[in-house]
Structures are given as C-alpha cells and as structure tokens.
C-alpha cells in the first residue's frame, strides 16, 4: 500500500495526543531551505523548526559530524568523561565570553537549569533566606513547557488546568523598566527575559530596554538571565540578540540551532560565581554533554562562523522585511524584524493565510492568532526570498 500524507495525518491524529495543531503537511525529505512531502511536492520552509534549523536542513558538515561520531561513541553519561566534552565546553565558553558552561538537551531544560542556578546563587552568594528567592518574568514570554516554565507564563493556553504553579515568581509587562523596578524585593534572585519575544509574535522591546535591565540588575545585585534559545546563533543578525544593545547577561540560555537541526543540544553559560553553586549530585542530565551532541554542536557553530550567517541573516532579513512591508494589503498591521526573525501582524486571524501559503509552496505558522512568523533557514538566497515574496503577494492580494 502506498503511504500518503492523508494516511500519515490520520494515523498521527488517531494514536497521538492532540497537543499541537500543525498545518496539514507531511515532511518526508529536507535539504537546505526546501522540504518535500511523500507525494513529491516541494515547499520552502519559512519556520526552520522554530529557529532550530538556522544552518539549513541536513547541512553536509553537520551531518558528516553526526555520522563520524556515531561510528565511534554516542553516549557515556556523565558518570565518565568523554573526549569531546572538554573541547566543546571550551568552545562554548569562548563563544559566550563566560567562565563555564553546563550542557543539557532541550531548551526548557536549559531554562530550568538557569533558574536553579539563580536560586542557589541567591541563597549561597547573595544571602537570601532559604526558600524565599524570587524570579521576575515578563508577560508574553515563552520559556518552555515544564511546570516551572509555564509558571513564568501568563498565556492561558499554556497554563490552564496545570496548577498549582511554582511559587516565588513575579510577572511584569515586557518592555517596561519601571514595572521591573517596582517588582524587585530583597529576595529577588533574577529576571529572565527573551531579548526578543518569539512566540508572542516577534516582539522587539523599546530601544535601551535591555541596557536598562542590565544596569538595574547590576545595581540591585540581581542576575540577568537571557533566554536566547530561539534568538541565538545568528537568527536576529547577531550571534546573540542581546548584542543589539551591547548587553551581556549573567546567564545565557541556549538551545535550538545549537544542535544544527539534527540533535537536541542546549546549555547555560555563566561565570564562576554562579556556576560554582553546582556540586556533584546537585544537578545533572544523562544525555547532557554526550559526545554525539558535542560533535554536532561544534559543527553547527563552525557553519555559522564559516558561512558568515550572522551578517547573512542581517542583510537577508532587511531585504526580506522591506519586501514584506511593501506588500499592498490593507489587512497588514505591522512587520517587525531583527535579521531573519520576522513577525508579520495582521488585523485578523492568519491561520487561513498560512494554509493558503502552504498551497502555494510556503510553510509558515501563525503565532498568537494574528501574526505570521517568517524565520527561514539563514542560508536562504535572494532568489529564494524573491520566489517567496511573489507567492506571499499572490495570496494576500487575491
């Protein structure tokens, strides 16, 4: 029997939990910015697996690293050393300009690790009374799906019927420095922010906001945690989005593109004063820092650096965003962009537009009902962007 997209979608819906609402498309092959379905139809990927595929699908260098390491050793656990963890931690420390790195697997694991580090630091270094440490988070955030992460959230879709939530969290309006100042208490350990909010619809904070957050954290002896899981590794036209304001957080949270689109790799990076709160047995991960992850991750960073994807994202993002802004359609409210991290907000829900774009060969996804996120692999060419713009115009103007 020939397996069709319809068969696969029906089987997935029957046997799988319905915690996602994907477009009716099945991806069976991928290369660069393009994917194919089982019927052989080609589509341009404008989502990049939520920015996990910045280097393009199946980049040859990353796949080669994966295969070579898979032929040697894939997993040792942290009960033993492996020969790539040392070089990988050094590489990551140099990249982030931090003393130490702690490897995990998924983005939300890195978020959890950062918050645990901040709480321990508050008790052991700052002197907060035990079990009283507080974390400040911003409305509209997305830090993941664990109970701790959704405790930071104010999104009803993410939080409904999952309580009780983790205590010690104060929420403030994103972009409002005065709100942060009012939320700070003697027990505040850290503030966690996305430098640009992704799931909220590519929300860019007011100019100077991150710099003021950095200054306030330094003044009040609070840690600044930057969740760069989605914005990191060249997505916004900088290696890390904090660089748009020349800001250095106390803790970097990294993931997604760190794994080159082929393996889950995440990490936090911080200086010794923070990292030294961890002692054997206080935190861990069986798969974190495994040799396969290290090999893939170093190749993923090589690709970003060797192919100059930071500048490519910056230049391509400006070109693509300008083209989107020039589209003549009165339903468009605003186009927000940093590099190839682009949100096109409409005055109405956009699910139907995404489905029509799929029919034209473009895969993108709505976020928060009224916004389409355009975040193609950073290897996209000018000709490919022009191809996409033509079809976006056709859908919107017809």
From Swiss-Prot:
Residues annotated with N6-(pyridoxal phosphate)lysine modification: 256
GO cellular component annotations of the record: cytoplasm
Enzyme Commission code: 2.6.1.13
Keywords: Amino-acid biosynthesis, Aminotransferase, Cytoplasm, Proline biosynthesis, Pyridoxal phosphate, Transferase
HAMAP family: Ornith_aminotrans_3
Function: Catalyzes the interconversion of ornithine to glutamate semialdehyde.
Protein's recorded name: Ornithine aminotransferase
Organism field: Oceanobacillus iheyensis (strain DSM 14371 / CIP 107618 / JCM 11309 / KCTC 3954 / HTE831)
Taxonomic path: Bacteria, Bacillati, Bacillota, Bacilli, Bacillales
